Amino acid sequence: MSPERRIEGLALKVGPLGEHDRLLTLLSDDVGLIRLAVPGARKPRSSLAAAVPLTTMELQVGGRSGLLRVRQLRVQHNFGNVGQRLETLAAAQALSELSISLVAGDDPVPGMLSAVLMHLERLELLAQKQRSSEMKSAEGERVDRTLATLVQACVHLLALGGYGLPLQTCCRSGAALSPPIGNWEWRCSLLADEGLAIGSQAGAAIQINPSELALLQRLTRLELPERQDGGLMGPRPVWLRLFTLLESWCRVHLPRPVRSFAMVREAVANA
């Protein structure tokens, strides 16, 4: 029997395994992406029933061979509050799917877990803000920030996972991507197989203007770009365009589709 060990991480996905067990997909700094059997977790009053998605936990695991089994678990934090709003739930699920696409088993990605947790914490805060019937603008700002948080999270996670969209150099000419703010005729094209190219290119998945490119380039920073009054920089249509751009990039380059992107788009449209 292999020695038991402790693993800490974030549950990205949990599904049924047989009649009473669950299959847990965990993101960890130590082992990357690992799949674990959680015996009896579907039984009433099971001590392992807390193995649910979007939960950070400490596990004691072991097993003879093949799929390791969870012996004990201790919940550290549950991000279930993101489910209070459809848009934050969809964004959190998209983060989980994206992480699964970017991290291989037994191949940890430094910084991936902390980045995912940072953006989940932001989504959780957005979900917990009370609704105000008197201020529709505040509700709209919350939806916009949810979308912007996901867009920025995609930029961060793709870069960490080795699939980052090059944001500083034209993929065709090698020239610097320096958006000429105020020149509304200038365009930058996403060639999904290659990257961003200066000008209106044939076959482009989407074209963006100078201010949209400048906003996209700022997303590599830690915080979301804000105006001087503290409001989010950029209106919702711009964030939707940047979301479409990154969605197109992911569709071509990632090994599996992020299906929750469609749910995010629907949730934002219906908000």
UniProtKB/Swiss-Prot annotation:
Gene Ontology cellular-component annotations: bacterial nucleoid
Keyword field: DNA damage, DNA recombination, DNA repair
Pfam families linked: RecO_C, RecO_N
InterPro entries named among the record's database cross-references: ARFGAP/RecO, DNA_rep/recomb_RecO_N, NA-bd_OB-fold, RecO
Membrane-spanning residues: none
BP term (GO), one: double-strand break repair
Role description: Involved in DNA repair and RecF pathway recombination.
Similarity section: Belongs to the RecO family.
Protein name: DNA repair protein RecO
Organism: Synechococcus sp. (strain CC9311)
